[in-house]
């Protein structure tokens, strides 16, 4: 179940304020058990190893959750067209376990000349990211039976997941992409 709750307040002059709180989830995955066999140093002297877990670092799991608060102002014009704008505030939480075996492919490992394993890749608990964006919308009657709607949401610029800076590109950057919707309603 993904929560969604909203409240609106009608104002004078055909305008209104609204608050909407909603969440997104779905990247809750787990890979339990299994083994991974690999050669840790390629043609080097280390032997081939079989280690527990999907990627050789124990059980693997990933979780991403997002929560949004839209603060909206809308106005209905004399011709029946409604326009709206919203500030979108966002929070994300992310956690991953069991991917430490990929440490040799990270930016921080390469920057150390291959001498230090990354500390911002796996098994660091829940990390939080916060950000904001904008949403614009239009709702217009085309006839007595048909209405048209369009919405555009800008990219939501987020703070970085510092605890997982070696996992994501751009040192933990995980912005939420822009969104565009268009539709018709038939009465």
Report residues per predicted region:
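Outer-membrane beta-barrel porins/channels
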Residues: 2-187
């Amino acid at each position: 179940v993904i929560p969604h709750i909203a409240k609106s307040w009608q104002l004078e002059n055909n305008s209104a304020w609204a608050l909407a709180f909603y969440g997104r989830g779905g990247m809750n995955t787990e890979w339990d058990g299994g083994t991974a066999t690999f050669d840790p140093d390629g043609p080097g002297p280390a032997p081939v190893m079989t280690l527990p877990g999907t990627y050789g670092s124990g059980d693997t799991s990933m979780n991403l959750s997002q929560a949004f608060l839209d603060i909206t102002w809308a106005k209905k014009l004399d011709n029946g067209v409604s326009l709206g704008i919203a500030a979108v505030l966002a929070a994300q939480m992310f956690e991953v376990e069991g991917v430490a075996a990929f440490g040799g492919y990270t930016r921080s490992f390469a920057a150390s000349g291959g001498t230090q394993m990354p500390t911002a890749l796996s098994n660091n608990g829940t990390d939080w990211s916060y950000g904001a964006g904008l949403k614009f919308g239009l709702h217009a009657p085309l006839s007595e039976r048909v209405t048209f709607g369009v919405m555009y949401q800008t990219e939501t610029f987020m703070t970085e997941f510092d605890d997982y800076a070696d996992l994501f590109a751009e040192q933990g950057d995980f912005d939420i992409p822009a969104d565009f919707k268009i539709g018709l309603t038939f009465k």
